[in-house]
């Protein structure tokens, strides 16, 4: 089955060098408590509903052939056991309060969409970034064919990855990838399991593999008070020790933000991020200085 595309973002300047088109795929093996794109976690189509946009015209109830929408205590409720995710209710929703997330693309369709912005790539040194969710856990045959096609057409290809995927997936595609934007969240394995649901051993092993084959590695570290940022920078220092022997092209320190809260409401998912905070600007500079002191030169706060 073809992977589902969550979004195609044009003119991105935060997902690699130059002006880029970022393709977000649905589905991720991690379950990060602070996930900024909860609609990307599921490998299947998701339904999102924004009650603040809804005018309660109830047209969707009348038009749903599966009788999957009802009113309970004045609110519209979707009955998951009846909903076929057919999209019929979307066609009659004048306010756009209802949406289905996830579309299939033939490789030729996706490449055609990407190539619309070729002139921007050429003039800015940009290209395409494949992101997610987790792109490295998508159908390998599809992914391999996509990156080969883009590479053969002279388009710079970046992979934004959490690193939690079979090593053979990286072995298959790395020759046609220009750079990897590689997330490192935590060094401590128990903490990694606590906050993401998975061990970080596979992630760190894949990172070492990419280094061994000479891949261009760009590290991205989300900085979150209460997760990997503390008074003594213990976790950051452990991350530095992991990265020290590797050939790292750049490091992006990404301050936590909570602008995604509305997405959880639209997905009817529990929002668990109230405990997290963005580090102060002083702390961010302190962490940046730590990396500089350890001979990492290309350090940036932000995307």
Language-model features: locations:
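Iron-sulfur cluster-binding cysteine motifs and their immediate structural context
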Residues: 33-40, 59-78, 88-103
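N-terminal pre-triad scaffold of radical SAM enzymes
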Residues: 5-59, 76-85
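FAD-binding FR-type
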Residues: 82, 103-109
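Short glycine-enriched, charge-decorated loop/helix-capping segments at active-site entrances
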Residues: 40, 99, 193-199, 268-276
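Auxiliary Fe-S-binding modules of radical SAM enzymes
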Residues: 2-17, 223-303
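Conserved AdoMet/S-adenosylmethionine-binding subsite of the radical SAM
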Residues: 108-260, 265
């Amino acid at each position: 089955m073809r992977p589902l595309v969550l979004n195609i973002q044009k003119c991105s300047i935060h997902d690699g060098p130059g002006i880029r088109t970022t393709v977000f795929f649905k589905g991720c093996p991690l379950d990060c408590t602070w996930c900024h794109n909860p609609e990307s976690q599921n490998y299947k189509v998701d339904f999102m509903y924004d009650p603040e946009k809804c005018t309660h015209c109830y047209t969707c109830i009348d038009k749903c052939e599966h009788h999957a929408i009802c009113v309970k205590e004045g609110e519209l409720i979707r009955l998951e056991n009846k909903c076929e995710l057919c999209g019929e209710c979307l066609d009659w929703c004048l306010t756009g309060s209802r949406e289905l997330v996830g579309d299939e693309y033939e490789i030729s369709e996706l490449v055609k969409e990407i190539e619309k912005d070729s002139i921007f790539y050429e003039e800015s040194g940009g290209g395409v970034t494949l992101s997610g969710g987790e792109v490295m856990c998508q159908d390998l045959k599809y992914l391999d064919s996509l990156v080969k096609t883009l590479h053969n057409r002279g388009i710079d290809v970046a992979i934004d990855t959490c690193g939690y995927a079979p090593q053979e997936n990286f072995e298959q595609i790395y020759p046609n990838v220009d750079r990897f934007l590689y997330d490192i969240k935590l060094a401590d394995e128990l903490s990694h399991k606590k906050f993401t649901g998975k061990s970080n051993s596979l992630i760190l092993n894949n990172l070492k593999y990419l280094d061994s084959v000479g891949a261009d590695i760009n590290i991205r570290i989300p900085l979150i008070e209460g997760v990997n940022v503390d008074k003594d920078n213990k976790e950051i220092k452990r991350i530095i020790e992991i990265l020290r022997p590797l050939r790292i092209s750049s490091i992006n320190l990404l301050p936590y933000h909570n602008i995604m809260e509305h997405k959880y409401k639209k997905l009817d998912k529990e929002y668990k991020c109230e405990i997290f905070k963005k580090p102060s600007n002083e702390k961010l500079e302190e962490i940046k200085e730590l990396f500089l002191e350890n001979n990492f030169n290309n350090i940036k706060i932000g995307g």
